[in-house]
């Protein structure tokens, strides 16, 4: 009898708990899509710094999970700390993205705003580089805390695909289809490494087929000593122009872009070794077939 009563009591308790859980689990469609996300504010692009002192990552803002901030945590323990947020640098201004930047983020499957990418600059674990609203910023890790500074570069079109040299003494970037190098010293001016960039010719950028089909998001690479770069020149003049729809929350727009449809022409590629100081170029022969947008990556 006691066993029967015990089993009955447990059954009643289980049913009551299930009923409560069912009531608590009721979610509206609005809550499912509201902020904060039910899965939590998950970090992305986690990296260990070159010297192993830090673990860096992008973290959604507490105010808006669609805005990413740059954070880091000591690798030997300690609390994570925010290094910089877009709002700290833009001063209330709205973040700007060019069409080229939007397409690059789309190819990386990134829908958030704010600081959407970064890299460690050099091997001493003291500086990181990131793009924001068409400009480039460097944040230094100092004894007094992180200090972010916008790099003094010529105004105009956004600086794309910025990458520091392995020693952290220089960086390269793409602007208006051309590749530039810049020593990271006070008062230094960028050096144009190429000059024939145009609406159909670009240097140092991954074209559509490379990014979508070959998982190659880069178009140039620094040498280990930081003295030269391997860069791809992309000629899309033979790629057909297609019209595609862009769907926004409140409207739909039509835009034209060069799109290598199946069975049609791809972009033509050429590879060059470029001196980072002078821009002197030496063309490298590509394997058969790679000249038509089928180069994967060095090595």
Which residues are covered by each model-predicted region?
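Beta-propeller folds
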Residues: 23-299
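Bacterial N-terminal signal peptides
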Residues: 8-19
